[in-house]
Regions:
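Ankyrin repeat A-helix N-terminal signature
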Residues: 24-30, 58-64, 91-98, 123-127, ...
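Ankyrin repeat structural motif
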Residues: 30-38, 64-72, 97-107, 138-147
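Ankyrin-repeat boundary/linker signal
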Residues: 47-49, 81, 115-117, 122
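Start-of-repeat signature of ankyrin repeats
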Residues: 51-52, 85, 119, 126
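Leucine-rich solenoid repeat scaffolds
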Residues: 119-161
Length: 161
């Protein structure tokens, strides 16, 4: 009975904190807050209400190596998609992410050729993590993705994918 009460209190606290604060902790590198939420029973792949991204999306976008590693160890889905169809590897191509994050995601099976949702008016289709890294001038990450078989959206479309 006591453990049920503790679980209910933890759930109420988490709901009262709003999911965005949990995700923001992942983005900001607040590893203790992320651990507390996970220890209290937060679903590792819970999505926020605004961008529909998981903790892992936010940690990757924020360049938080330790939190990415923690979340992967906790069973986070490295191929989860957010509201734009981006995976955490798509976000690893931004200007705050590190090569370590891309390496961790790829080592755990991130799809290097995942395509996000096509923006309106684009004829070539969605963008891959390689496209995102290239646009972000993240040559080291782009080379890593390419080394693991990553292609651009245009290359995939030319192949009929």
């Amino acid at each position: 009975m006591k453990s049920l009460l503790v679980s209910i209190v933890a759930a109420v606290v988490l709901v009262g904190c709003k999911s965005i604060s949990i995700h923001k902790a992942a983005f900001d590198g607040n590893i203790e807050a992320v651990k507390q939420h996970l220890d209290a029973g937060a679903e590792v792949d819970a999505k926020d209400d605004k961008f529909v991204g998981t903790f892992l999306h936010w940690a990757a976008a924020g360049g938080q190596d330790e939190i990415v590693e923690l979340l992967i160890a906790a069973g986070a889905d490295v191929n989860a998609t957010d509201g734009d169809g981006d995976t955490p590897l798509h976000l690893a191509g931004n200007n705050t992410a590190t090569k370590v994050i891309a390496e961790l995601l790829i080592a755990k099976g991130a799809d290097v050729n995942a395509m996000n949702l096509s923006p309106p008016g684009r004829e070539i289709g969605g963008m891959t993590p390689l496209d995102m890294a290239t646009l972000g001038n993240r040559t080291e990450i782009a080379n890593l993705i390419r080394k693991h078989g990553g292609k651009t959206g245009a290359e995939l479309k030319a192949e009929g994918n």
